[in-house]
């Protein structure tokens, strides 16, 4: 396997050819915050939390979609980057109604965990709280609460790339973006949903939840994505 050398925060390291900066950083013991990225799904660079500084680059680069190159000099936790990440989290908090005390994902929310990690306990921006559709609990097993959505599209990618149903999609832009089911159908009336639950498991917040879960009862498992994708690539199952 071909290997490249690069410098991360002043320390020389190495990584396989073709990996992203995010993968290279993690392989060298440097963790970067992410919300939209999830191993097993195609990276899209949407949340902008994994931005890094690369010497010679004219702008900050999203590590999850930038390929690591030989000789790169990368900074991951400068004062500028930390300010950007905190501001990004504050903007996410201001766009929707993120009230942790009444959320089913309280204690298992990736957004809240990152806020705690980076010291974000409020938003300096005006709370927008757009006029959103009501909570959809028409599905037999799952619920959809638009108030918690951060537009990471993990659920959409899991439904499309892993399950192959493409039941979920996103409409609108910015604060007006929201998840839709089968082109504006209720989730319970969907003809394409297989009820597999992959979308609920990959959701980083309380947007998608198991019906019957009360506050702080959500437990999600995302490791299955890497297992499924790896099995398909290796043709471990004859029916795939």
Region locations from a protein language model:
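Residue-level recognition of oxygen-bearing side chains
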Residues: 20, 154, 198
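Eukaryote-biased recognition of intrinsically disordered, low-complexity regulatory segments
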Residues: 1-9
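Fe-S ferredoxin-like electron-transfer domains
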Residues: 48, 57-192, 201, 206-240
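Internal gly/pro-rich beta-alpha loop/helix module
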Residues: 195
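Extended, non-catalytic structural segments that build the interaction scaffolds
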Residues: 9-11, 144-145
């Amino acid at each position: 396997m071909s290997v490249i050398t690069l410098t991360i925060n002043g320390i020389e390291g190495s990584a396989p050819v073709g990996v992203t900066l995010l993968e290279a950083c993690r392989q060298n013991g440097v963790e970067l915050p992410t919300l939209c990225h999830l191993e097993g799904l195609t990276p899209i660079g949407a949340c902008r939390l994994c931005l890094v500084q690369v010497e010679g680059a004219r702008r900050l680069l999203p590590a999850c979609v930038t390929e690591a190159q030989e000789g790169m000099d990368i900074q991951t936790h400068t004062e500028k980057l930390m300010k950007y990440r905190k501001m990004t989290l504050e903007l996410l908090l201001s766009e929707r109604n993120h009230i942790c005390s009444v959320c089913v994902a309280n204690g298992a929310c990736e957004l809240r965990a990152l806020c705690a990690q980076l010291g974000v306990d409020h938003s300096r921006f005006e709370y927008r709280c757009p006029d959103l559709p009501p909570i959809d609990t028409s599905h037999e097993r799952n619920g959809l609460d638009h108030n918690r959505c951060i537009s990471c599209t993990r659920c959409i990618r899991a439904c499309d790339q892993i399950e192959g149903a493409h039941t979920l999609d996103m409409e609108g832009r910015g604060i007006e973006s929201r998840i839709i089911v089968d082109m504006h159908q209720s989730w319970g009336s969907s003809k394409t949903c297989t009820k597999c639950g992959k979308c609920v498991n990959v959701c980083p917040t309380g947007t998608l939840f198991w019906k019957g879960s009360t506050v702080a009862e959500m437990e999600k498992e995302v490791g299955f994505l890497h297992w499924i994708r790896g099995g398909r690539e290796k043709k471990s199952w004859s029916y795939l």
